[in-house]
């Protein structure tokens, strides 16, 4: 397998406006990146260029089609906590699809990603945790905070939420 040179990938930013993103990622690594993964929306040319054939179902779908499928799947869950976990998994795998689904169904989904369900999500964090997302600082690591904050992964942090989780009640 040869690594493609930096190529542009056309992404839909969730509003219907395409934008191009330069990336050297390909194959499974591209699909594992929630920012760059477009799921079944990769075109045949993109699938060839980024070595995705065989890693995705052969059918190419628009963002609208993906949103419809995910909404149908979401509505099939029995509880809001299950729907919350489903949406967190979607956010961890395909942020474009997550944000499009949320934006197009905000009245229905806001109570799931925010109050009241987010409280239950926090209370069940250990059970629902799938992948690291964010920055975790804890008392046992207080002497290493400078080293933790120096991690290059946190260079582009835009939002910080601080909580001790003590006020989350259902």
Language-model regions: role of each:
Residues 1-37:
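Basic/polar N-terminal segments that are highly enriched at the extreme N-terminus
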Residues 26-28, 35-135, 154:
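Conserved, well-structured core domains of diverse proteins
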Residues 133-143:
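Short coil-to-helix leader/linker segments, especially the first N-terminal amphipathic alpha-helix
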Residues 138-140, 160-164:
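Short beta-strand segments
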Residues 142-152:
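Short alpha-helical segments and helix-capping/turn motifs at coil-helix boundaries
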Residues 156-158:
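A general structural motif
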Residues 168-170:
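Conserved small/polar residues in nucleotide/adenosyl-binding loops
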């Amino acid at each position: 397998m040869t690594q493609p040179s930096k190529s542009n990938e056309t992404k839909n930013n969730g509003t219907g406006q395409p934008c191009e993103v330069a990336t050297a990622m390909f194959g499974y690594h591209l699909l594992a990146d929630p920012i760059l993964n477009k799921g079944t929306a990769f075109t045949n040319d993109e699938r060839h260029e980024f070595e995705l054939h065989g890693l995705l179902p052969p059918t190419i779908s628009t963002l609208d089609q993906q949103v419809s499928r995910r909404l149908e799947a979401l509505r099939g869950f029995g509880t809001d906590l299950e729907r919350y976990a489903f949406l967190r998994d979607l956010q961890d795998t395909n942020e474009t699809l997550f944000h499009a689904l949320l934006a197009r169904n905000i009245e229905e989904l806001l109570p799931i990603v925010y109050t009241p369900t987010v409280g239950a999500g926090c209370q069940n964090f250990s059970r629902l945790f799938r992948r690291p997302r964010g920055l975790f600082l804890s008392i046992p690591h207080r002497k290493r905070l400078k080293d933790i904050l120096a991690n290059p992964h946190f260079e582009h942090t835009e939002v910080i939420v601080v909580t001790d989780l003590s006020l989350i009640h259902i």
